[in-house]
Amino acid sequence: MKIAVIGTGNVGLVTGTCFAEVGVDVTCVDIDQKKIDNLNKGILPIYEPGLEEMVERNVQKKRLHFSTSLKDSIQGAEVVFIAVGTPPDEDGSADLKYVLAVAASVGEHMTHPLVIVTKSTVPVSTAEKVRKALQEQLTKRGSNLDFYVASNPEFLKEGAAIEDFMKPDRIVVGVDRPEAEELMRKLYKPFLMNGHPIYIMDIPSAEMTKYA
């Protein structure tokens, strides 16, 4: 299975590396060339116990790649995770400009159906905005490609993020199409071997769990 993770901060880098660890072909994407150059040299922008060794191992096994090209990275990918920052806006709400810019860019460059998943911490109704931003680009291209949106909030504690991802006490996935559910179940299957539950729900409910 092949995925792309957009954003190489704490959430993106941990997500991408942990999926690579269970055999998924992962490309982590960032617009910051220096960050990508450093990652390709094994220099990480964050510290998480166990992360550096895991990155090195999966880069050597050619399961984990780093790139500045979203266009190249989503070719052949079945799932694209948005894990970019959502800095607080002037009124304190999450600024979604980076999330929606990624969605628009995916819409501009996608060549096959895929699932686009919000992993960043976002307010309820973000998935609908992602859908709209992506659809606008497809319409502009005159394309009728199918795509599915999903919400998959993270529950990673700083300093224990690898442990939290590899041995989750729960996995929350919000979908509104069976195709998206099937792909997300397939992707998370290795993490369910120890009986950890996966909760499949509608998208707004999944978006709410981070605030519950």
Q: PLM features: residue spans?
A:
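Structural/interface elements that position substrates and couple domains in central-metabolism enzymes
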Residues: M1-A212
